[in-house]
Design a protein with these regions (language model features):
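Short, small/polar residue-rich loop motifs at catalytic or cofactor-binding pockets
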Residues: 280-281, 402-405, 469-471
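Extended C-terminal subregions enriched in glycine
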Residues: 464-466, 499, 508-555
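Noncatalytic scaffold domains of N-terminal-nucleophile
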Residues: 27-63, 67, 75-76, 80-242, ...
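Internal maturation/activation junctions in enzymes
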Residues: 31-32, 316-423, 575
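Glycine-rich phosphate/pyrophosphate-binding beta-alpha loops
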Residues: 295-304, 405-409, 419-431, 468, ...
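Bacterial N-terminal signal peptides
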Residues: 9-21
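Active-site rim segments in enzyme catalytic domains, especially the processed small/beta chain
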Residues: 88-95, 99-113, 265-270, 416-480, ...
Length: 585
């Protein structure tokens, strides 16, 4: 059994001594679509280990994963513990009230498994769920309250994975978080700053959330020792009774009541919706870039498809001769990215409802045709979606997918690995808190309008459907089939770009994973070219404008966490834009 007092004292000491200090002048204004504001940047160096490694978004989470592996646990065991801890210490980003995508590498049998724990639409919704008459609701009006809450899936997916690949008993995996919730954790700078922004319209409205995040009417302060006994009780129930404790019984009744009686935007969730949720195992999406196999999640995640598309369309470009902050690289990267996002918006949705075979979108010949227009000297143009499906009558939809998410990467002592991206969507989700955790607002990842020009939008709202996601947990394998990289990021729909750019840094520019994560970020979602503020890449604004780019210099708050196998060592990388740390041995 885990010695809970040892963990608590170690974790609290780490948090008290190694919390990141952010600039007091950190920009607090948000770009449209970036509500989880940037909270600063601190340079990080690669962490090297030999036996195992954990990289997560908060020191408490990294150390509980390390603790589990030291007790003989597997990568999946560590993932269960990390997710429970993130629910406590990083509640704005993910939690047991949300969903997740999990990649698991079984090193002994050399098999990659994927688990879909994406949230699901309740049975009572319809295609007009977010329509206000003939017009779609404004996104910020739709996000708050019960209407946006999807049936959670993260715990169910972890339970399914644990039944297959866990080593330690399920009921031992929550001990660290339960103890920390009972005794208190140190509120991090990032959590305190995000609460202080006072941006979420519902966080002060719902009593349970308001009481927790605004004690005595004031926002949580950095350094406060915060307890969450309600979450400790919930996790004790999950530890003893499994995921059904969340999906059936008294807690399920509380969730349904909170959703359906919300004072803002009440929803229509049923006990049957919660009880009937089923996580799914899906085939991974894999393709070869250079001599590497790039593998990710299948739909409803667009990550596996789109990360590979973006990379493959750049394969004909001499990227290794370019500099990461050069005009040439920024121009070709933006062109490939625009082509990728055009396809994403038109074609990708939950394939249990949209029967378009995604293999056509990663077909080598199709991507070669798409890439013919990419040229380092060519002015940028808004891209049109391709035509991988012939004459299928499909309308291009839009959805607002926001960057409130968390990612962690794990390699255990046996070489098994986890890449898991987990989310409640918006900063603090729907704003509704039940049982000490926040409920997601993932239904706003659907396209609000069900049709466009009389044609159906693939990512429209439907009962039992899972909304499209850009979450991109990714693994990279060499030409012999050996695992080389485990990576992923938060960042809303920009996740695809963050992961692809980092992989280019490793594969084409020859950087280690920390150097690649540190690279100044740029994105183009077929709208404008975003350059990371305060970095050398921002100097490209003028030359890219001359190439007809619409350029915005903004904060780009990725949260990449990854592990690289190199020369017999494990190299861990944690994003300097967030609070994550790499630990191991």
């Amino acid at each position: 059994l885990i010695r809970r007092s040892w963990f608590y004292s170690s974790a609290i000491t780490l948090a008290l001594t190694s919390c990141i200090v952010f600039s007091a002048t950190a920009q607090q204004k948000r770009e449209v679509g970036e509500p989880e504001a940037a909270t600063g940047y601190i340079e990080k160096k690669a962490f090297v280990a030999e036996d195992y490694m954990v990289v997560a978004a908060n020191p408490y989470a990294s150390w509980t994963g390390k603790n589990i592996i030291e007790k003989g646990g597997s990568a999946i065991d560590a993932a269960v513990a990390i997710q429970s801890m993130l629910s406590l210490v990083e509640p704005q980003s993910s939690g047991i009230g949300g969903g997740a995508f999990i990649l698991y590498w079984d090193n002994k049998n050399k098999v990659l498994h994927t688990f879909d724990g994406r949230e699901m639409a309740p049975s009572a919704v319809d295609g007009h769920w977010f329509m206000d008459g003939n017009k779609p609701m404004k996104w910020l009006e739709a996000v708050v309250g019960g209407k946006s809450v999807g049936v959670p899936g993260a715990v169910k997916a972890l339970e399914l994975a644990h039944k297959q690949f866990g080593k330690l008993p399920w009921n031992t995996l929550f001990d660290d978080t339960i103890e920390t919730a009972e005794k208190g954790f140190k509120v991090s700078p990032r959590l305190a700053k995000l609460v202080a922004l006072d941006y979420h319209p519902g966080l002060k409205t719902f009593p349970s959330s308001s009481t927790y995040f605004y004690p005595a009417g004031m926002p949580l302060k950095e350094g406060t020792i915060k307890k969450n006994k309600a979450l400790a009780k919930t996790l004790t129930g999950i530890a003893e009774h499994g995921a059904d404790y969340l999906h059936t019984g008294e807690l399920a009744e509380k969730i349904v009541k909170a959703v359906n009686t919300a004072s803002i935007n009440p929803g229509k969730m049923t006990l049957e919706d919660l009880a009937n949720y089923t996580p799914k195992e899906r085939d991974p999406v894999c393709g070869v870039y250079r001599d590497k196999s790039i593998c990710g999640m299948a739909p409803p995640s667009s990550g596996g498809i789109n990360v590979f598309q973006l990379l493959k369309m750049l394969e004909g470009q001499p990227l290794s001769t370019m500099k990461p902050d050069s005009v040439a690289f920024a121009n070709v990267y933006s062109q490939a990215s625009a082509l990728t996002y055009a396809d994403r918006e038109k074609f990708i949705a939950d394939t249990d409802f949209t029967k378009l075979p995604y293999a056509a979108m990663i077909n080598t010949a199709y991507l070669a045709r798409r890439a013919e227009s990419i040229d380092a000297d060519k002015p940028w143009r808004k891209a049109k979606a391709g035509n991988p499906y012939g004459d299928a009558e499909i309308a291009m939809g839009t959805s607002m997918e926001l960057p409130n998410t968390s990612h962690f990467s794990i390699v255990d002592k046996e070489g098994n690995a986890v890449s898991m991206t987990t989310s409640i969507e918006f900063m603090f989700g729907s704003g509704i808190m039940v049982g000490g955790f926040l409920l997601n607002n993932q239904l706003t990842d659907f396209s609000f309008s069900p049709t466009k020009n009389r044609f159906p939008v693939p990512n429209r709202v439907e009962p039992g459907k899972r909304p499209r996601s850009a979450m991109s947990p990714t693994m990279v394998f060499d030409d012999k089939g050996d695992l080389e990289v485990v990576i992923g990021s938060p960042g809303g729909s920009r996740i695809i770009s963050y992961v692809a750019q980092t992989l280019i840094g490793i594969i084409d520019f020859g950087l280690d994973i920390q150097q690649a994560i540190n690279l100044p970020k740029m994105t183009n979602r077929n709208d404008y070219t975003a350059l990371e503020k305060g970095t050398p890449i921002a100097d490209l604004e003028a030359p890219l404008t001359k190439l007809d780019h619409t350029v915005k210099v903004v904060d780009l708050n990725s949260g990449l966490h990854g592990i690289q196998f190199k020369s017999g060592k494990l190299i861990g990388g944690a994003d300097p834009r967030r609070e994550g740390v790499a630990v191991g041995q």
